[in-house]
Amino acid sequence: MPQLQKPAPAFAGTAVVNGVFKDIKLSDYKGKYLVLFFYPLDFTFVCPTEIIAFSESAAEFRKINCEVIGCSTDSQFTHLAWINTPRKQGGLGSMDIPLLADKSMKVARDYGVLDEETGIPFRGLFIIDDKQNLRQITVNDLPVGRSVEETLRLVQAFQYTDKYGEVCPANWKPGQKTMVADPTKSKEYFETTS
């Protein structure tokens, strides 16, 4: 099972990137933050809502030096067929993020999200920092999708703590107060709360 503050499990495979097959690997993203999210299956129900939402927000992630990759145990051919299916028919349409094919199930297994009985991954989401260490891990059961806004906020918060060495309180957003992780200095933050 992957651990926070430790190197993310290396991966490599074929993805659909801008409508074509391309080999990608974790090390391609060194120097950038990366959101790697797993979803159960192509041509399903909750999955397209998440993938489309991440794709539509890809530019926001790129503005903060972060890329996003979706991954399932489907083949790259199935990914491409789903991308080429119109959204009004349950397809994805044009994508602004890569969809990684994990037909061998190795990536999902290495990240600890594979349901061994069904061969499909749970909805795992991993934030990997610019040094390729894991900073955040969440895993949802199959019927509930994830929040793109919360994922973006978490990346921003980790980047802030990396840069300034301060900690971010609950519900922190860029521009809001942070605190120094020190019993005395943290009081400056708490004095401003009600």
Swiss-Prot record:
Q: Which SUPFAM superfamilies match?
A: Thioredoxin-like
Query: Is Disulfide bond found in the keyword set?
Result: yes
Keyword annotations for this protein?
Antioxidant, Cytoplasm, Disulfide bond, Oxidoreductase, Peroxidase, Phosphoprotein, Redox-active center, Ubl conjugation
Offer an example of a GO molecular function term for this protein: thioredoxin peroxidase activity
What are the subcellular locations of this protein?
Cytoplasm
Query: What InterPro entries does its record include?
Result: AhpC/TSA, Peroxiredoxin, Peroxiredoxin_AhpC-typ, Peroxiredoxin_C, Thioredoxin-like_sf, Thioredoxin_domain
Q: Does the keyword Lipid metabolism apply?
A: no
GO BP terms: namely: cell adhesion; cell redox homeostasis; determination of adult lifespan; germ cell development; germ cell migration; hydrogen peroxide catabolic process; removal of superoxide radicals; response to oxidative stress
Report which superkingdom the organism of origin falls in.
Eukaryota
The chain residues annotated with the modification Phosphothreonine are T193
Catalytic positions? C47 (cysteine sulfenic acid (-soh) intermediate)
- What EC numbers are recorded for this enzyme? 1.11.1.24
Subunit-structure text: Homodimer; disulfide-linked, upon oxidation. 5 homodimers assemble to form a ring-like decamer. Also exists as a monomer.
State the PANTHER family in the record.
AT16346P-RELATED (PTHR10681:SF163), THIOREDOXIN PEROXIDASE (PTHR10681)
Q: Which family does it belong to?
A: Belongs to the peroxiredoxin family. AhpC/Prx1 subfamily.
List other remarks.
The active site is a conserved redox-active cysteine residue, the peroxidatic cysteine (C(P)), which makes the nucleophilic attack on the peroxide substrate. The peroxide oxidizes the C(P)-SH to cysteine sulfenic acid (C(P)-SOH), which then reacts with another cysteine residue, the resolving cysteine (C(R)), to form a disulfide bridge. The disulfide is subsequently reduced by an appropriate electron donor to complete the catalytic cycle. In this typical 2-Cys peroxiredoxin, C(R) is provided by the other dimeric subunit to form an intersubunit disulfide.
- Entry protein name: Peroxiredoxin 2
Origin species: Drosophila melanogaster
